[in-house]
Amino acid sequence: MLAGATDRCMEAPTYAKFSAIGALSPSHSTPFDARANGFVMGEGAGVLLLKRLSDAIDDGDDIKAVIRGVGGSSDGRGKGITAPSQRGQVQAVSRAYSQAGYEPSTVELVEAHGTSTKVGDATE
């Protein structure tokens, strides 16, 4: 199965909205840094080839990663995208650990959202 996505957000109205709330950095993104002052907008796309682990092993594929758990959250009842819920983030990560059968202390890498905003970084 191929799974892909794109993010096209550089239209003027979107840029203006993030700029108006002070979410955009005037220089560069520095997530989880005391000097963080917002993020830099960008666009991108990606596609992954997903396959059952047993099939990939049987086919002799060069396996780069295994998805063992997934957790998600939506802050629809909260203040919205600009003020993420710490509770929701904790629930999402807890679900992923539970599905994967891992303890948090065994995780070696976390791919964070890293918005370089005070609220977003503090929540993560």
Language-model features: locations:
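Condensing-enzyme catalytic core of the thiolase-fold
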Residues: 1-124
